[in-house]
Amino acid sequence: MADRQTPYKYFVPRKMASWVTELEDILWPDNKIVEKIKKRAAGFANAGIDTAINYGFHLRFDFSDYFETLHGYYKNVCDELHKYGIKFMDHYSCNLIERPRTKEDFFYLHNAHRHHVLLHKDPIAAKFAQYEGYFFQDICEKRVNDGTRGYSWNYQAEMFCHNNPKFLDMHKKYLERLFKDVPMDGMEIDDMCDYGAFSTCCCDYCKDRFQREFGRELPNFEDKEFWGDTSGNPTTWGNYNNPAFRDWVQLKVNSVSDHIKMVKSILGDRPLMTCCSATGPMHLNGLALNLERFMDNLDLVMLENCGMSVHTVEWGKMEAEALIQKNIALNMGKAPAIALSYSTYDTSAYMGWSFARFWGVSNWASTLIGRLSHNPGDIKEIHELLAPSNNWEDRYSPLDTDKGEDIYEVRLVNNLLCRENGYRDEEGREHWTKVSAWSKVFIRTNVGYRFLRYTELADAKRLMSEDTPIILDNCGCVSDEQYTAIKVYLENGGKVIMALPFGIKDGKGFIREKPLSEELIEANYPGLVLIDNNIVDECCVAQLIEKGIIKPRIHQVEGETTWAVRIRKHEDKLVMHILNRAIEAIPHSTLTGAMHTGNILKDIKATNNGDKVSYIIDINGIADKWDNLSFMSPEIGSIKRGVVVENLGHNKVKVTIDPKNIMLYGIVM
């Protein structure tokens, strides 16, 4: 599977917002609903939103009795938004139906997932629920332990099987009807995964596919050589030392991937994305969430970068996922990457907008008011929360994020093969554990970096196309193709920073007779640098900088070191983004999240002093000069603060910025 070179060809969503629906909207064409559509569409236009995305009526087949009315509502929404040049994308879950099985589940569902818009069948009616002649209970996944219908504890839902041809035909017919009824501009199909994790599915279609594709029989649940320890969450089940189980992991991904391919065949000239908002950790194997295997049939990439809780201030934890998704989008013909942020109050909406600007991606502002402990009575509509940031951007700092070029000094490898084969080192650490640790330390040291994924790692020409060093940390699984490319890169003077183990298993997860690292070390390549395999911190990076192995373009010389700094090139212009790491959450006094996520974020405060900061920037090769700069932020409106610029010679420029009273974000341009 190769990365895509064909350029992205659809509309580019830059300022997205959720079109939040409520149960009363199913009463369309009631005059109240029609007027509400008109009012909100005008609000979206005034907020500078270019793309609205449906948010509600989510578990779509729970509304199969009301599709005519629902589609009439959506057509009305499309028509009204199109008057303002705003695109409208649908967004729904295709393979879940809400079926709470106990009173506790029932009340939990109605407390934690009200934003779905809930109208599920009662237990008696559920037996007869169907669409296009397909009874829902006949197309559900089956539990591997007893053959009963699978169940998602996260969503109190039953799940349709991605391999069941009746479900696939039902979904296909629904999509054809939807596009006939509604002039949708694009689509996000959610839950293209398996929320039963490894507890499902043992239906005949899945077992037959396992036999056809891998020549294997699915073992009984009692076979611990295959299923491993099943006492924990089903995402943790499975014995990765068994190649048959590793094939089962791939089977689950293949099943979802083929479903996505079918959906794409129906969409025609419309972009498709799915909810695959994380890429790195191994537990995603159980959920069959694997964007790198899905990307061939997707057009847009969504990254779910933050929520509404007080923990949102710890934004550095989210960056690794955000930037690897951005790299995937870049290798889908430079498709837009979209950062989804959930907001309750003005500050969290501003934070989501700021994160998107800092990462150089499109912003999707949304909310999860259906997951709040109660209605505080002061909740704004999402376009009202988003308008100040969008309008400031349009007026003072318009940037096409999809055209920006990231400036970086290091390539950080995240090798999908490690995750897929269940690799852990002797300390039990995943490859992703070390990768995400590098991401965090690069934020703290202002080293520019990008991700290098498994496909690029197997391509010597792409490795040699840049002179930035490559970091390989805890990369236990390495394919023969990847190893060959790495050797060619080193033989041609490339630099590799390596923390062992490396290549103790092959690309399919089988143990090698001898780790590949031994051959590399014996070859004594000048560009191979071995580092401690336990420590990823500022001291480690400082040593690599001191030795000239990493050559950062940004070097702070004065002021507090609490600002994260990124440089991006827009056409012939350099832009510097700064984002505060020293922020503290101000929680709402009573409002909490329903899924044990803690207090809702009400506001933030900066814990640094806001003193002037100075950086020496190496502009060699990226700009002839960098001067006449201003510092701006939505927090100071139309004011442009002067930036002191000193030309130090040798393509180095010293810039001094005054971030006084800036809580979160600013830009130098």
Description of each model-found segment:
Residues 19, 89-94, 188-191, 228, ...:
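Aromatic-lined carbohydrate-recognition surfaces of secreted/lumenal glycan-active proteins
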Residues 26-44, 167-178, 283-294, 348-353:
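Short, acidic/polar
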Residues 32-60, 181-184, 298-301, 352, ...:
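Catalytic domains of carbohydrate-active enzymes, especially glycoside hydrolases
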Residues 17-32, 55-71, 152-172, 239-257, ...:
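The substrate-binding groove and active-site-proximal loops of carbohydrate-active enzymes
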Residues 347-349, 461-462, 473-668:
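A conserved amphipathic helix/loop scaffold
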Residues 28, 90-182, 225, 234-249:
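Active-site-adjacent "subsite" loops/lids of carbohydrate-active enzymes
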